[in-house]
Swiss-Prot record:
Residues 43-56, 117-136, 209-243, 294-336 are cytoplasmic. Orphan receptor. This is Probable G-protein coupled receptor 160. Its main location: membrane. It is found in: Cell membrane. Belongs to the G-protein coupled receptor 1 family. Glycans are attached at N8. The lineage of its organism: Eukaryota, Metazoa, Chordata, Craniata, Vertebrata. PANTHER family: G-PROTEIN COUPLED RECEPTOR 160-RELATED. It comes from Rattus norvegicus. Keywords: Cell membrane, G-protein coupled receptor, Glycoprotein, Membrane, Receptor, Transducer, Transmembrane, Transmembrane helix. Residues 1-21, 78-95, 158-187, 265-272 are extracellular. It is a multi-pass membrane protein. The chain crosses the membrane at residues 22-42, 57-77, 96-116, 137-157, 188-208, 244-264, 273-293.
Amino acid sequence: MTALPSKNCSFQYQSHQAPRSLDATCLLLLIILGKVLLNVLILRVKRKDTSWSFMEYFCFSLALVDLLLLVNISVLTYFRDFVVLGIRFTNYHICLLTQIVSFAYGFLHYPVCSLACIDYWCNLSRATKPSSRWQKLLYLLTVILTWISVLAYVLGDPAISASLKTHKTSVNQCPSYVSTQSHWLSLSMLMILSVAFLISWQEVVALIQAIRIASYKNKAVLYFPFPPHTSYTVSPRAVLLPRLIVCFLGTWFPFVALQVLILSLRVQIPAYIEMNVPWLYFVNSFLIAAVYWFNCHKLYWRDGMFPVDPFINWKCCFVPVHRLKQVERPMSIIIC
C-alpha cells in the first residue's frame, strides 16, 4: 500500500512501495482481523461493574464498525468482481472503503475526546443524576450523530473527494492516511503527564514506597496512606496529583511507553489502525483523572459522583478507610 500527499491539513502522508509479491488485500484483512480481536479482548477483560458513559457507547460502536469493515472487505475479497443492484464491485472498492474509513477515523479523535470530557464534567458537577433510560438514549443518539457527522464531512469535503477520485483506476496501489489528530493528542497527554510527574516526583516516590495492596470488600485495592480527615471531602490538588499519577501509570505504563516509542521513532500508523478501543480507554482514563484534578473541591465519597473507569478504580485515591474492620490483613507491600 502506498501513502500519497494530500492538501488536507488534518493528515500527513508517507510513500512506500510494497513488494509486488505481497498480496495487499490479504495483509489488510489480517490487520483488520487483528484489530477486531484486540477490540473484543479489551471489551471482555474490562471491569463489568462500570456505569455507562459516552466513551463506553462509542467504544462499542467502534468495535462494531471495525467488525463490519472486516466483513465487507472479506466479501469483496472472496467474490472479487460481482454486481449487486446494478452496481459492480471490484478490488478497487476495497481500497475505496479503507480510504473512507481512514478519513473518518482520523477526524474522530478530537470530537470524541471533547464529548467524553464534557460528559464527565457534567456528571461530576450535577447533584442529581437523570433517569438512566434517558441518559443511555442520549448517549446512543450522540454516538450515532457523531458517526453521521464525520461521514458527511468526509464524503462532502472537496479535497477528500478529489483525493478519492484521483486513485479510482489504481488497483495495486492504495493510499493509506495518517491522522495528525492522534499525534498531537498523544503528544499533549505525554507532555502533561511529564510536567505533572516533574512537579510531584518526590511525593510520587514517597507514595509508591508506602502503597499497600489490601483486600477491601473482597476486592484487591491499592491502599494509600491518608492523613486524618474529619469529613469525606477529598484532599487538595497538590495531595491528589501524585495519587492520580500512581493510579494512571500503574495501569497504563506499558501504553505510555508505547506512545513514547511511537513518537520518538516518528512511526506513521494508518488511521484505520490507530483509532482502536485500547487507545480510547487509555484516553478515557486520562480524561477522568484530569476532570478529578480540576474538580477536586467538588468531589465527595459518593458512588453517584464518580464516573466509573473500566480499568482503574479511582476511589482508592479518595476513600480514606477509617474503620480497620473494613480492611483485612494486607496481602503484600510494594517497596520501591
